[in-house]
């Protein structure tokens, strides 16, 4: 299945049914009076979060949706049937943006959660409604109102507590395989990971967190190099970032430079995201000479002037991964406990997430516009959609 994490759609609620103009006509009943019924309300449009979905691909090929109109009223004071609501399933983690106002319309973060995105039109009134002591034969009715119309943009961001950062082949996917039951593809060539992978890390019976691995970044990613930075937006919901660096890179590069490359790209993408709690993971220490591990790891930390937590691991051999998982769990539980006890802390976190999401959208749109201008300058088709030529992948949420 193709992984699609953005889709523009247009939705239109149903029109309300018109009220009926009718008078009672019955044998032996003279001047029976008005009996025109009201119309039915138009159907509304709802988005419904579904945990069984993990892509927005269906909305890429079918972008227009309309709910049912309400039926018109009838004689004998019969009310028209209400139009059926239209329920559109979307993956959990979908953000809804009004494209006309560029405001966030809502966020679907729990299975079964509903969000009304277009209100159905109000029913029209039949002439029965207008009878009075001075108007026994009303001929007035009202039409049903139009349903709401909206142009929306759906953005899917995976729901994870912890996000992985690093260059291609740093060992991020191997780490997720080591600490969870997820089985992302692992190989000795760059860009093995093409879409976000999720894994659930169970520290104890009732203690667990979700970790996300995104495609690796390279220098210039913020300008579109490699797979670009489009997947960085999936980290905006994460409470902790794990910055993994290969301590024995096959290309002979300097681990310190590799850490700085990612930090620079993160800063360019979203300054708020770059200020997230970030732990440094020195991976592949099993490939270093035993007598050099201590000195080389210390040298990297010193040159970086790193003040945050540092961990030495071997994702392939599962060395240090269990201890790290426990410390991550403790860190997350402390955050969650603070937010339960302090509403201000929760409000501040939501503000940060909204700021990161806004910065991510702005940067991604800037890159798309730059690529569009480059295509126009080269005389290429302006209708080209880069997502139509994206890779075909299997995306599984474990």
Curated annotation (Swiss-Prot):
Transmembrane segments: none
Cell compartments where the protein resides: Cytoplasm
Protein family (similarity comment): Belongs to the TRAFAC class OBG-HflX-like GTPase superfamily. OBG GTPase family.
Keywords associated with the record: Cytoplasm, GTP-binding, Hydrolase, Magnesium, Metal-binding, Nucleotide-binding
GO biological process: ribosome biogenesis
GO cellular component: cytoplasm
Encoding gene (name): obg
Domain Obg: 1-159
Domain (OBG-type G): residue spans on this chain: 160-333
Cofactor: Mg(2+)
Record InterPro entries: G_OBG, GTP-bd, GTP-bd_Obg/CgtA, GTP1-OBG_CS, GTP1_OBG_dom, GTP1_OBG_dom_sf, OBG_GTPase, P-loop_NTPase
Highest taxon above the source species: Bacteria
Function recorded in the entry: An essential GTPase which binds GTP, GDP and possibly (p)ppGpp with moderate affinity, with high nucleotide exchange rates and a fairly low GTP hydrolysis rate. Plays a role in control of the cell cycle, stress response, ribosome biogenesis and in those bacteria that undergo differentiation, in morphogenesis control.
UniProt: Mg(2+) binding residues: 173, 193
Name listed for the protein in its UniProt record: GTPase Obg
Protein's organism: Cellvibrio japonicus (strain Ueda107)
Assembly: Monomer.
Gene3D superfamilies recorded: GTP1/OBG domain, P-loop containing nucleotide triphosphate hydrolases
Region (Disordered): 128-148
HAMAP family: GTPase_Obg (MF_01454)
EC number in record: 3.6.5.-
Gene Ontology molecular function terms on file: GTP binding; GTPase activity; magnesium ion binding
Binding sites annotated in the UniProt record for GTP: 166-173, 191-195, 213-216, 283-286, 314-316
